[in-house]
């Protein structure tokens, strides 16, 4: 049985966001609607972040994978009150090291990173956080170059163990800065390791 728990939203106040989540998990959703749905969810995540930050960001960088740059990340950028944001975009390759345990490695094969001085807020945006390997690789690259005061990890959907597993990959001096913002926690995966209902098989 595929179990999903909604967080940061309620059926009474956020039916529009829940409807967007249903659209994402529908395998018959068209590409155009799928992309537009990610943009709208990005805007909603950005609005949630603004509530947390009270518009006090300081020097800010947004990091994302290349496949999330045009839709989800753009939605976040359009919604947050901080408009001067440095960008970091990564192209990752996913390599499965162990088929049995679904252990994965995600090396960066290309990156675009804008300069930033004294980063205070690092925002990492991902369409879904499952094994955390992509986010881990991106964060490792960035925290080596800078020492942000706050790290916000935004994703519409997260697998139930993703937060714990990502935190274990970093020393407490880094992981204590993490704050995760999501709308749904999923508890199931299929035989291929895809989160269910997830975001349509991604």
How would you describe each model-predicted region?
Residues 1-202:
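PRPP-associated nucleotide enzymes
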């Amino acid at each position: 049985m595929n179990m999903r728990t909604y967080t940061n939203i309620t059926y009474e106040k956020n039916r529009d966001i829940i409807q967007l989540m249903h659209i994402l998990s529908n395998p018959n959703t068209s590409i155009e609607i799928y992309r537009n749905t990610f943009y709208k969810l990005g805007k909603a995540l950005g609005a949630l972040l603004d509530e947390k930050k009270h518009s006090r960001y300081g020097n800010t960088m947004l990091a994302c994978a290349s496949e999330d740059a045009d839709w989800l990340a753009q939605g976040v950028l359009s919604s947050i009150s901080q408009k001067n944001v440095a960008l970091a975009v990564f192209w990752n390759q996913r390599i499965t090291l162990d088929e049995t345990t679904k252990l994965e490695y995600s090396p960066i094969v290309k990156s675009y990173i804008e300069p930033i001085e004294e980063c205070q807020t690092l925002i990492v945006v991902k369409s879904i956080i499952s094994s955390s390997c992509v986010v881990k690789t991106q964060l490792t690259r960035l925290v080596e170059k800078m020492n942000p005061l706050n790290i916000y990890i935004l994703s519409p959907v997260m697998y139930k163990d993703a937060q714990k597993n990502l935190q274990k990959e970093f020393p407490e001096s880094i992981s204590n800065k993490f704050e995760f913002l999501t709308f749904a926690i999923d508890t199931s995966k299929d035989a291929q390791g895809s989160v269910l209902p997830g975001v349509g098989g991604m």
